[in-house]
């Protein structure tokens, strides 16, 4: 069972963007139904547009020079907002997630917006193809599960060693502080931003 997708036009500072987003009430209803059957079922976080994704989109809009003629990959893209902003300036964009439902939603946005330079792929950062490369890696609000921090750090190291520029946004969660501190030696630039009344840190990482 899946929530219906609704086309929304987001009004952001200096730009607008169309995005297919699952109906929030239907998402809640389906989640509570599933929870009655399986108490440990996780909430589908991909169905919501998070402040870190908004901040990433705003940053990319303000810094198109980072994306010009580049190959861009977003991991755990969810609804894909940063990818779709990047597509306005980049050569090619791959927006990926490990959930089929998220991929279906992003593909609907791609078709609606006729984004010929965007592909949507099913990718799990625990099992990335060995040949996968990119010029720029986008990661927004991916450091929310401490159990994933070690694997996530290995993924970041892999792309850093390839010469990839990584742009990462994260809300300032206390539990994520050790993970972010571990990345600071790789940090070339750091910005403090606000989106939806939430403080967001943006890190630009490169070897």
Show which residues each predicted segment covers:
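S-adenosylmethionine-dependent methyltransferases
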Residues: 1-207
């Amino acid at each position: 069972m899946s929530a219906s997708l609704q086309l929304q036009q987001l009004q952001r500072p200096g730009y607008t963007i169309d995005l297919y987003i699952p109906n929030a009430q239907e998402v809640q209803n389906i989640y509570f139904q599933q929870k009655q059957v399986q108490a440990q079922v996780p909430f589908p976080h991909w169905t919501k547009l998070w402040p870190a994704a908004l901040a990433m989109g705003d940053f990319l809009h303000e810094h198109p020079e980072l994306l010009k003629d580049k190959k861009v990959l977003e991991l755990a893209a969810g609804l894909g907002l940063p990818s779709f902003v990047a597509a306005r300036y980049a050569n090619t964009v791959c927006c990926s997630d490990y959930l089929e439902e998220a991929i279906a939603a992003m593909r609907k946005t791609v078709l609606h917006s006729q984004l010929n330079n965007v592909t949507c792929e099913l990718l799990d950062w625990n099992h990335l193809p060995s040949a996968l490369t990119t010029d720029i890696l986008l990661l927004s609000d991916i450091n929310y599960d401490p159990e994933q921090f070690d694997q996530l750090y290995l993924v970041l190291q892999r792309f850093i060693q390839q010469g990839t520029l990584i742009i990462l946004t994260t809300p300032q969660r206390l539990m994520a502080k050790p993970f972010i501190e571990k990345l600071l030696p790789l940090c070339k630039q750091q910005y403090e931003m606000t989106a939806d009344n939430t403080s967001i840190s943006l890190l630009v990482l490169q070897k």
